[in-house]
Structures are given as C-alpha cells and as structure tokens.
Amino acid sequence: RVDRRQRQMCIRDRDNTPPIKISGNLNLSGISYEMPIASAQVKSAILFASLNAKGKTLITEPLSTRNHTELMFKQLGLDIEMNGNKINFNGQNEFEGIKFKVPGDFSSAAFLIVAALITPDSSILIKDVGLNSTRIALLEVLKSMNANIEINNKRKVGEEDIGDCLLYTSDAADDLL
C-alpha cells in the first residue's frame, strides 16, 4: 500500500525488500490521492514523502484515521491544513528540528485498562498516556458503561493531548465479561 503511492510520487526504493532504503529525488511532485481504504500508515508515508515535493498534496480519506503525523507537522510549523477527512499539505517547507515528547500509546494501554476494570480490588495509574481523540474510543465506551475512570493532569505536549488515567475495579465489570 505504501510503496505504490510513493512510486506514484516518483520515489524509487532500492531492492523492494525490508528495510527499504528510499533514494532521494529532487523532482518530487505533490499528488491528489483519494484513499480507497483508511490507512494511517499510507497517509503518513505520503505526507513524509511530500516534505520535499513541489506543489500541493491533497489526501482524502474514506474515514478519518489517527492524526499524529499531521499534528507533528503542525508543531513543526509546516503548511498543513486538516479539514475532516481531507488533508492539504504544501511541500518544500523549511523547518528546524525540535525535541519531541512522545506520549504513552493508548492502544497498548487498553489491555491494562480493561484488566484493571474487571479484576476485583484492583487499580492502575497510567501516566502520560496519549489522549488523542482519534485513539480513545475505548475510554468513551467504558465511560458510557459507568466504568471507574478518572483522567487527571490533562495537558498538551506539543500538539498532542495527554494525561494520567486512574482506573479501578468497576461495577461495569459484569458488562465487560
């Protein structure tokens, strides 16, 4: 899925085997791409390739996917616009590298969250976990089931929402089993 889009942008890989080495090309062009299936990986690969592309890249997703790459580009001050399932990016931006703090991965924490909720007399505190709205559907569902969830210390790090999740055995546990 990724390499086909990059070839469309005139990027060539070395041997077509992992790890893929991408050779530079000074004549990259932006593309307009309507994604047939939602894929954050394909979208991010196109956006990263578009950093050096001349012109505008427009990506249309059938469904919005996670937006960490777009938020990072925004934090870097790059010319990116996000409007629903459409992403517009003007290539050939100059930017300075910055230090990033990467929040804890919510999808990895999901197993621990459910375990704490269904295990009698248990609790867990997950600090500095990412609370990006594109990643926390599980939390919303569990809250609607009256699960014992507290979100503390909510803040932004760069463009990402993070916080500390305190979870403990819930009466909703019977509904989860």
Describe the function of each predicted region.
Residues 12-35, 52, 78-106, 117-118, ...:
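Self-splicing inteins and homing endonuclease
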Residues 50, 73, 115-116:
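Conserved short beta-strand element of beta-propeller blades
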Residues 109, 114-150:
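A conserved active-site cap/scaffold subdomain adjacent to cofactor or substrate pockets
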Residues 1-7, 11, 168-177:
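Single conserved hydrophobic/aromatic residue that forms the stacking wall/gate
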Residues 60-75:
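Aromatic- and glycine-enriched pocket-lining scaffold segments that form the walls
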Residues 30-37, 55-64, 98-102, 124-129:
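Flexible, glycine/proline-enriched loop segments at strand-loop-helix junctions
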Residues 40-44, 48, 107-108:
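Secondary-structure capping and domain/repeat boundary segments
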